[in-house]
Amino acid sequence: MAVGVSPGELRELSDDELIERLRESKEELFNLRFQMATGQLSNNRRLRVVRQEIARVYTVLRERELGLASGPAGEES
């Protein structure tokens, strides 16, 4: 995954792609937390970046749910 995905890039993705991105990010966060607990994590900042990315995905999904934003290329989800 790219470091620091912008909300604009996320808004261009379909709902299915966003859900897949969310699943991947949560899996990565789980692995990072496991590495932190075992003392193997070398980049602590990555935890924060992944958490922020998860929050951005949830925000875009919620915007679409409330009708504040449409899907990619103006499609309604």
Swiss-Prot record:
Name under which the protein is recorded: Large ribosomal subunit protein uL29
Pfam family, one: Ribosomal_L29
SUPFAM superfamilies (alphabetical): Ribosomal protein L29 (L29p)
Residue ranges of coiled coil: none
GO CC annotation terms, alphabetical: cytosolic large ribosomal subunit
Keyword ATP-binding: no
HAMAP family: Ribosomal_uL29 (MF_00374)
Alphabetized InterPro entries for the sequence: Ribosomal_protein_uL29, Ribosomal_uL29, Ribosomal_uL29_CS, Ribosomal_uL29_sf
Keywords (A to Z) from UniProt: Ribonucleoprotein, Ribosomal protein
Superkingdom of the source species: Bacteria
A GO BP annotation: translation
Gene this protein is translated from: rpmC
Family: Belongs to the universal ribosomal protein uL29 family.
GO MF assignments: structural constituent of ribosome
